[in-house]
C-alpha cells in the first residue's frame, strides 16, 4: 500500500492523519483564515515546527487525502466565490469534546507524547489546568479505543500516549519497537503480552465503531 492510500476498516494513512491534525490546529490558532484553502493546508502540513515527522506533501497528495476524508465524513469542503476551503469534522464524526479534539490533533501531528508534552503543547489550543485534566481526557479517549497508552521504556522517565486511528500495521510497529527498546530490561519493565492484546482489542473496537459511522 502506498503512503497516500486510505487504509481499510476506517483507518487513515499518514498523510490523512497529517491533514486532520493540521486542520484541527489551524482551527484553534488561525480562526481568521479557517477553513483552509488547499494551498494553506499544504503549507500547514509541511510546517517544519510542531510536526513529527516533517513531511513534504504536494497539493495533489493533500487533495487526494481530503477527498478520502470527505468520503468518511472526517472533512468537509466549503465552496466559495473566491476559493474553496476545507474544514475538519473529526469532532462531529467521533463525538469529541473540545479538549479531546485538541489532544487528538496534537497526537496526529507529533505521534507519541508524554502528559507534560501534551500539556505544554496544548497551551495555544485549549486551557487545561494541569496534567490531571489531560490524563482524564486521554483516559476517556483510550476507553473508546481512540488513543493508546504506551508504558515508558528504557531511558524514558514517563509513559507516552498516541492516537489509534492510523494504519494498524504502523501501530503494531510502534508497539514492537517499544518492546525491543525494553528488551534489555527485566520482563516487568517491558510491554506485556496482556497489554498488547488489550491494545489490539481496542483497535478492533475502534474499527467496528468507524465502520458503523461510515455505514
From Swiss-Prot:
Superkingdom of this protein's organism: Bacteria
PANTHER family: UPF0502 PROTEIN YCEH
Listed InterPro entries: DUF480 (IPR007432), WH-like_DNA-bd_sf (IPR036388), WH_DNA-bd_sf (IPR036390)
Family matches, as SUPFAM superfamilies: Winged helix' DNA-binding domain (SSF46785)
Protein name listed in UniProt: UPF0502 protein PSEEN2299
Coiled coil: none
Pfam families assigned: DUF480
Similarity section: Belongs to the UPF0502 family.
